[in-house]
């Protein structure tokens, strides 16, 4: 019996060695990147800047509220340089108040802190908050847009031009999936202390006129509820842009950034973004999984 047991142990050990050797020598199987149903998309590795997969990534497209990622980058830069403070009180102009589209619901003449306006812009996607911040920094939204373009040039966003701080439709206002990935990478890298705002799921500000109840607005990034690894960034929609989403997720020490332009619906932009992130986390390690990738710069 002792001899049989020794033989079994020897056979088992040899079998395990063979299995291990076979596993180590097996070719790495990497499938083709998934088809993304959108006008343009890109997926990059945050640390290296390598492109994992992309489609029409340089195409000039309407960015809608993805514009606010650049607006926030400029505001964060002003904060970091000490030109403004989170506690600064901003007097709301008529122009900011009457700006159309999604709103934080601020009122003319009221004083609102930079911190609250940032949250209203990022979480609630408030166009009114975006204009108020732009005016606080640049004096006029048009001047602030010039500042946005200067930052875009510094970051190497060669396929972007901003005419306003909101992303409302305007001639010659455009960006690209690649540029938005570059911007998201820079924002997370340069302003980790402020980036966390993008992970907040809701923002409460103001009161309903009839009931007096606080107005609670939810972050439009559905992935914040669906995937614990996702911690930002921003959605966007206009008729011209379609449904857009720039997202970032971190898992097992690796961070990925995806950008999707021109999806068909709120659900589609979340689904297609999730598709990209899942693919990247499953098959990307230290090298691009498709053709030899390039570094975003």
Regions found by a protein language model. Give the residues of each.
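Bacterial N-terminal signal peptides that target proteins for export
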Residues: 1-11
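Hydrophobic alpha-helical segments, especially transmembrane helices
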Residues: 6-7, 69, 251
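Bacterial N-terminal signal peptides
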Residues: 10-19
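Hydrophobic alpha-helical membrane context
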Residues: 17-18, 80, 276, 284
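Active-site-adjacent loops and short helices of periplasmic peptidoglycan-processing enzymes
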Residues: 24-195
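Domain-terminus/edge residues, biased toward the C-terminal soluble/receptor-binding domains
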Residues: 157-161, 169-174, 178-297
């Amino acid at each position: 019996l002792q001899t049989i047991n020794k033989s079994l142990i020897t056979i088992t050990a040899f079998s395990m060695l063979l299995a291990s050797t076979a596993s180590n020598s097996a070719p790495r199987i990497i499938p083709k990147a998934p088809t993304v149903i959108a006008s343009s998309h890109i997926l990059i590795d945050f640390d290296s800047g390598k492109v994992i997969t992309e489609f029409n990534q340089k195409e000039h497209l309407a960015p809608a509220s993805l514009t606010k990622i650049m607006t926030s980058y400029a505001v964060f830069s002003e904060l970091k340089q000490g030109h403004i403070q989170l506690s600064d009180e901003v007097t709301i102009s008529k122009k900011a108040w009457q700006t159309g589209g999604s709103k934080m619901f601020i009122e003319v003449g009221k004083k609102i802190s930079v911190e609250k306006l940032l949250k209203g812009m990022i979480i609630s996607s408030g166009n009114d908050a975006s204009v108020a911040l732009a005016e606080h920094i640049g004096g006029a939204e048009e001047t602030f847009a010039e500042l946005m373009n200067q930052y875009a040039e510094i970051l190497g966003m060669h396929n972007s031009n901003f005419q306003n701080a909101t992303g409302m439709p305007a001639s010659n206002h455009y960006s690209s999936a690649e540029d938005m990935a570059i911007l998201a990478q820079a924002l997370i890298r340069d302003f980790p202390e402020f980036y966390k705002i993008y992970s907040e799921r809701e923002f409460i500000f103001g009161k309903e006129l009839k009931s007096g109840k606080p107005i609670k607005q939810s972050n439009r990034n559905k992935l914040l509820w669906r995937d614990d690894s996702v911690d930002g960034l921003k959605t966007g929609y206009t008729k011209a842009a379609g449904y857009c989403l720039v997202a970032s997720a971190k898992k097992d020490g690796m961070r990925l950034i995806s950008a999707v332009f021109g999806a068909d619906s709120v659900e589609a932009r979340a689904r297609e973004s999730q598709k990209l992130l899942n693919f990247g986390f499953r098959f990307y390690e230290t090298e691009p999984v498709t053709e030899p990738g390039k570094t975003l710069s």
